[in-house]
């Protein structure tokens, strides 16, 4: 599986995505559950904006809500198997992680991670969730238990062996907290990579190397 890891939206390497579409297909699921704790207007606006950009890249976008699959991973596996591209957008990384767990999307991603011809696009929270641990983000995102009581999850998906720190040295309203996060990773000897808005890391985890 290819991981297209971005800081803000889809970054400066969208030609890579266009080439991927040519070699595979253009159908993609858009997952916005990281925004579930936000107001409805913000959720709607963010989804529409991201759909527009993905359409311009060449994708045919279907929006899916992980809440529809809570406690029904069998249905998620069946429905998601019709696609081999998934886009997970930003918001609160702890809310996103809970939605992934309750729906079984986390296990689904791990299952297909070593298979060819799959694409995961993640930005902001959608990229942060890919690492091993999420505890370092508790000063940037509030670790709220959104869907169930006492359900905060501090373990990431573990699809990469480093922590992604987005919005580094960028025009971001919490940029001062990002600097603190970098310092914390250094102090606690946590492996990390920073991304400025616009920058992208592309990982081929089927081959265990960065593209």
Name what the model sees in each region.
Residues 86-87, 118, 122:
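Short glycine- and Lys/Arg-enriched binding-loop motifs that mark or flank ligand-binding interfaces
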Residues 97-101, 106-119, 126-211:
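Active-site-adjacent pocket-lining segments in enzyme domains
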Residues 1-85, 89:
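N-terminal beta1-alpha1 cap of cysteine-dependent amidohydrolase-like domains
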Residues 83-104:
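Catalytic-core segments of thiol-dependent peptidases
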Residues 6-9, 32-34, 66, 90-91, ...:
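Fold-independent oxyanion-binding glycine-rich loops
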């Amino acid at each position: 599986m290819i991981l297209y890891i971005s800081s803000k939206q889809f970054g400066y390497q969208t030609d890579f995505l266009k080439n991927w579409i040519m070699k595979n297909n253009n159908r993609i699921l858009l997952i916005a559950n990281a925004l579930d704790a936000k107001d409805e207007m913000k959720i709607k606006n963010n989804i529409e904006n991201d759909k527009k950009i993905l359409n311009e890249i060449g994708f045919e976008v279907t929006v899916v809500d992980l809440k529809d699959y809570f406690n029904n991973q069998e249905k998620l596996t069946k429905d998601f198997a019709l696609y081999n591209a998934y886009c997970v957008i930003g918001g609160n990384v702890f809310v996103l992680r809970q939605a992934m767990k309750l729906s079984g999307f986390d296990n689904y991603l791990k299952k297909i991670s070593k298979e060819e011809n799959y694409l995961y696009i993640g930005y902001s929270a959608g990229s942060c969730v890919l690492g091993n641990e999420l505890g370092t983000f508790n000063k940037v995102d509030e670790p709220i238990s959104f869907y169930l009581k006492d359900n905060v999850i501090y373990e990431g998906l573990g699809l990469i062996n480093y922590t992604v720190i987005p919005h580094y040295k960028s025009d971001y309203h919490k940029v001062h907290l990002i600097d603190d996060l970098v310092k914390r990773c250094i102090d606690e000897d946590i492996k990390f990579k920073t991304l400025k808005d616009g920058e992208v890391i592309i990982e081929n985890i089927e081959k265990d190397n960065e593209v």
